[in-house]
Amino acid sequence: MPVSLSTALRVVGTSLFALAVLGGILAAYVTGYQFIHTEKHYLSFGLYGAILGLHLFIQSLFAFLEHRRMRAERQPVRLGRSVALCIAAYQEDPDYLKKCLLSVKRIAFPDLKVVMVVDGNGPDDTYMLDIFHDVMGSERAGSYVWRSNFHARGEGETEAGLQEGLAHVQALVRSTTYSCILQKWGGKREVMYTAFRALGDSVDYIQVCDSDTVLDPACTAEMLRILEADPRVGGVGGDVQVWRRGGDGTHGGTALALVALTPSPPQILNKYDSWISFLSSVRYWMAFNVERACQSYFGCVQCISGPLGMYRNALLQQFLEDWYHQTFLGTKCSFGDDRHLTNRVLSLGYQTKYTARSRCLTETPTRYLRWLNQQTRWSKSYFREWLYNALWFHKHHLWMTYESVVTGFFPFFLIATVIQLFYRGRIWNILLFLLTVQLVGIIKATYACFLRGSAEMIFVSLYALLYMSSLLPAKMFAIATINKSGWGTSGRRTIVVNFVGLLPVSVWAAVLLGGLAYTAYSQDLLSDTEVAFLISGAVLYACYWVALLTLYLAMVARRCGKRKEQCGLVFAEV
């Protein structure tokens, strides 16, 4: 069969499958078909709930199978390949940057080239260059303060000076083991482009890393193992995890005892700094070890995260210019860099994978507003890249199509459900919905406790409320402002508070409170049965929160603020 005809058939088939999935979910939602229900429908179980439950079960099953496959991996790592680690830095907290660079020096991989590019070349940025020299060693490190960047001249820069700077940056990066470039501000994508362009085809693989990331010594070798094992894989991402300290304070076992096969507890650098950073840590674990692990089973991980990822350089150089010059609705894109990098790999028909054996620590916002801004930025890139990703459904497993449809449209179904319940239902319907949300959260949390082997994962169920109250309106706001660009969150050295993110949350809260008041006012008098259900449901809901908050105070709150223990890692020591 001709290639063009085969491709056309796959496009048609995949498109029909996507429409069938969406149509099936929509039909189940609209018809409201119920398998079982009590008299007057106080309790019921319908087709729509069954579909969502089946989705969670299948996703969890394939995630489990992928973890089992990861643990069984025994193929030796070929250390003869050349790898460059590219670090993107912007107004980084000095302590985080130092920890990042110290962990880089401890990576167990021979002749690893390190390129750090700083987004900014002013007096307020030079402290990062000083830290780079202090940690990496001035005798092996080269540096250059560039007045320009690859796409914009610095103030007073001539064309000849620009070309001289370009040549100097490329020569420096290719000739030195450790190099640090300070360049004219241009955003994270500009920083990444400089590192990729300067390296050219001088290495086989490129590893990416953010300046707030602490890397496990085996992370590079473990990602390389995946890429070397299958030429169809174009990129691989790792996990945010902790490697346990050995009893003598050295690496627990051999240097490439390679991330113990028994799952150790994932963590974030500032996990216990606040309630929001703690909940983010358990959410990160679910995102990586369930959602992305499932995607990895089918070779279609849709986002290789910036803190820890590796790509085939030959592929990266192939789409570098298209990646950098990406536009959306006529506007140049300057966020979603990592997701679009992953999408470019997928667009070429290559697989993307995830390995829990490659680990790192990263920083997450500790304040609600900064976290909200971060989530809004990520949601913008998700919806924009969803449209781009849909162009390549036919090149990959049907799971990629199915999951994209389900996760892409789920927020809209959820909003429609909430508004309908709050404005057209009864008080009991609203309470039952809240109970159902938490029940699903508890089921997911129980599975996470089993998979990870940690009781802390029970707090995944708390994240459900955060999703309903904050993430849902943030996603809608992200769609409304999808073309507004920027880093989205400020640098960590100077935190800038942005109150814009509160607008959609406030509007959403007003909508819900208004609906609750309207329903309470307009509904008929409650029957004795409904009163009994309301009292029972309210008591059950209150008991749930009392139990979870008690556990939180006992297990988590007492540790908040004790950042010292976060540095007690083999690869995070200072």
Swiss-Prot record:
<feature type="topological domain" description="Cytoplasmic">
    <location>
        <begin position="66"/>
        <end position="398"/>
    </location>
</feature>
<protein>
    <recommendedName>
        <fullName>Hyaluronan synthase 3</fullName>
        <ecNumber>2.4.1.212</ecNumber>
    </recommendedName>
</protein>
<feature type="transmembrane region" description="Helical; Name=2">
    <location>
        <begin position="45"/>
        <end position="65"/>
    </location>
</feature>
<comment type="pathway">
    <text>Glycan biosynthesis; hyaluronan biosynthesis.</text>
</comment>
<feature type="topological domain" description="Extracellular">
    <location>
        <begin position="37"/>
        <end position="44"/>
    </location>
</feature>
<keyword id="KW-0333">Golgi apparatus</keyword>
<dbReference type="GO" id="GO:0031410">
    <property type="term" value="C:cytoplasmic vesicle"/>
</dbReference>
<feature type="transmembrane region" description="Helical; Name=3">
    <location>
        <begin position="399"/>
        <end position="419"/>
    </location>
</feature>
<feature type="topological domain" description="Cytoplasmic">
    <location>
        <begin position="516"/>
        <end position="530"/>
    </location>
</feature>
<feature type="topological domain" description="Extracellular">
    <location>
        <begin position="552"/>
        <end position="574"/>
    </location>
</feature>
<keyword id="KW-0472">Membrane</keyword>
<feature type="topological domain" description="Cytoplasmic">
    <location>
        <begin position="451"/>
        <end position="456"/>
    </location>
</feature>
<feature type="transmembrane region" description="Helical; Name=6">
    <location>
        <begin position="495"/>
        <end position="515"/>
    </location>
</feature>
<feature type="topological domain" description="Extracellular">
    <location>
        <begin position="478"/>
        <end position="494"/>
    </location>
</feature>
<dbReference type="GO" id="GO:0085029">
    <property type="term" value="P:extracellular matrix assembly"/>
</dbReference>
<feature type="topological domain" description="Cytoplasmic">
    <location>
        <begin position="1"/>
        <end position="15"/>
    </location>
</feature>
<dbReference type="InterPro" id="IPR029044">
    <property type="entry name" value="Nucleotide-diphossugar_trans"/>
</dbReference>
<comment type="function">
    <text>Catalyzes the addition of GlcNAc or GlcUA monosaccharides to the nascent hyaluronan polymer. Therefore, it is essential to hyaluronan synthesis a major component of most extracellular matrices that has a structural role in tissues architectures and regulates cell adhesion, migration and differentiation. This is one of three isoenzymes responsible for cellular hyaluronan synthesis.</text>
</comment>
<dbReference type="GO" id="GO:0000139">
    <property type="term" value="C:Golgi membrane"/>
</dbReference>
<feature type="transmembrane region" description="Helical; Name=5">
    <location>
        <begin position="457"/>
        <end position="477"/>
    </location>
</feature>
<keyword id="KW-0808">Transferase</keyword>
<keyword id="KW-1133">Transmembrane helix</keyword>
<feature type="transmembrane region" description="Helical; Name=4">
    <location>
        <begin position="430"/>
        <end position="450"/>
    </location>
</feature>
<dbReference type="GO" id="GO:0005886">
    <property type="term" value="C:plasma membrane"/>
</dbReference>
<keyword id="KW-1003">Cell membrane</keyword>
<keyword id="KW-0328">Glycosyltransferase</keyword>
<keyword id="KW-0812">Transmembrane</keyword>
<keyword id="KW-0968">Cytoplasmic vesicle</keyword>
<feature type="transmembrane region" description="Helical; Name=7">
    <location>
        <begin position="531"/>
        <end position="551"/>
    </location>
</feature>
<dbReference type="GO" id="GO:0050501">
    <property type="term" value="F:hyaluronan synthase activity"/>
</dbReference>
<comment type="similarity">
    <text>Belongs to the NodC/HAS family.</text>
</comment>
<dbReference type="Pfam" id="PF13641">
    <property type="entry name" value="Glyco_tranf_2_3"/>
</dbReference>
<feature type="topological domain" description="Extracellular">
    <location>
        <begin position="420"/>
        <end position="429"/>
    </location>
</feature>
<dbReference type="GO" id="GO:0030213">
    <property type="term" value="P:hyaluronan biosynthetic process"/>
</dbReference>
<dbReference type="GO" id="GO:0000271">
    <property type="term" value="P:polysaccharide biosynthetic process"/>
</dbReference>
<feature type="transmembrane region" description="Helical; Name=1">
    <location>
        <begin position="16"/>
        <end position="36"/>
    </location>
</feature>
